[in-house]
């Protein structure tokens, strides 16, 4: 297959992956963890998945420790956790 044909195939597949929501059965367990700012004093605006509200919300992360339910962008949070 030519490289052009491969690109034509990969483009729609990549778009499908980005636009397909995560089902609750596919959602990583860490998405259920609460927001955790950690003990440090930084002021990083990040996002976490709130499983009660079924949406990604912003919070202030201190910069260390915390947990895996911590995303730099809302898009990354939605792609990983939102159904």
Curated annotation (Swiss-Prot):
Any GO CC annotation of this UniProt entry: extracellular space
BPTI/Kunitz inhibitor domain: residues covered: 31-81
SMART domains in alphabetical order: KU
Keywords carried by this UniProt record: Disulfide bond, Protease inhibitor, Secreted, Serine protease inhibitor, Signal
Protein family per UniProt: Belongs to the venom Kunitz-type family.
Biological role stated in the UniProt entry: Serine protease inhibitor.
Protein name: Kunitz-type serine protease inhibitor nigrescinin-5
Organism expressing this protein natively: Cryptophis nigrescens
Top-level taxonomy: Eukaryota, Metazoa, Chordata, Craniata, Vertebrata
């Amino acid at each position: 297959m030519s490289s052009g044909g491969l690109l034509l195939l990969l483009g729609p597949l990549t778009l499908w992956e980005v636009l397909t929501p995560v089902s609750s059965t596919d959602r990583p367990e860490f998405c259920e963890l609460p927001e955790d700012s950690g003990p440090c004093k930084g002021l990083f605006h990040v996002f976490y998945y709130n499983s009660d509200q079924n949406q990604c919300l912003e919070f202030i992360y201190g910069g260390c420790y915390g947990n895996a339910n911590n995303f730099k962008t809302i898009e990354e949070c939605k792609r990983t956790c939102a159904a």
